A protein has these predicted regions:
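Beta-strand signatures of extracellular beta-sandwich domains
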Residues: 117-121, 168
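Short beta-strand-plus-loop segments that form exposed binding edges in beta-rich domains
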Residues: 170-176
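Short, surface-exposed tryptophan/glycine-enriched loops
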Residues: 142-166
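Short, intrinsically disordered N-terminal pre-domain segments
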Residues: 1-16, 197-199
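Solvent-exposed serine/threonine-rich low-complexity stretches and specific carbohydrate-binding patches
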Residues: 131-143
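Terminal (often C-terminal
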Residues: 34-114, 124, 135-136, 177-199
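Extracellular beta-strand solenoids
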Residues: 6, 11, 19, 28, ...
Length: 199
């Protein structure tokens, strides 16, 4: 093995320097430190994150929640990387990878002790959706007054093909007069998407 001692590597022409060839492994020894003052790309990691919310309150079941979604614009909020897209309640991922998905639902019961299920459904063929989580919330009876409660449901989705792997979000109410809460000011019922890394 040859040893090359240098303090600075600069390109002889242009602005790029290539280390090795495709398929090679570049090894950084244990205890070594990479000091980066610029922008590092191609290392995977968290490259995309966004939050969506449902803007309008509705009664009863929804399979899926097909309308009134928007990207959050609350104070200090910002999306990272490429954006998710939504059409009729179907969410499309902007890139392949392992994605963390959290669905939070808020219930308002009218006058009693009722439960609701807020579940994530996924497809791998852009057609048949399968339930992948089950989370239930219970609005306790408080003497006939309205009760509010929230629950979250989480999944890690392996998006191998953005054209076919998609998600949607369902709610099933025990009492169809109960509400799923929505707001255009902050997420009451909403979804968080975080890309964890490469598939």
């Amino acid at each position: 093995m040859s040893l090359l001692n240098v303090n600075t590597i600069e390109p002889s022409t242009g602005t790029g320097v290539t280390l090795g060839a495709s398929g090679d492994t570049i090894t950084i020894p244990s205890g070594a430190t990479i000091a980066n003052s610029g922008t590092a790309t191609g290392f995977g990691g968290i490259t995309a994150a966004s939050q969506w919310r449902m803007t309008t309150t509705f009664e009863g079941d929804a399979a899926p929640i097909a309308s009134n979604w928007e990207v959050s614009d609350s104070t200090a909020y910002a999306s990272l990387g490429s954006a998710m897209t939504e059409s009729s309640g179907i969410f499309t991922f902007p890139s392949t990878g392992f994605w963390f998905v959290r669905f939070t639902g808020m219930i308002k019961t009218d006058n009693g002790a009722d439960r609701a299920a807020y579940n994530i459904y996924a497809t791998t063929n852009n057609s048949s959706y399968v339930q992948v989580t089950e989370s239930q919330v219970f609005g306790a009876n408080t003497g006939g007054s309205n009760t509010y409660a929230s629950v979250s449901s989480e999944a890690i989705v392996d998006v191998t093909d953005t054209a076919n792997v998609k998600v949607q979000f369902h709610v099933m109410q025990e009492n169809n007069s109960n509400d799923t809460m929505g707001s255009s000011s902050y997420p009451q019922t909403g979804v968080t998407f975080i890309r964890l890394g490469d598939t």
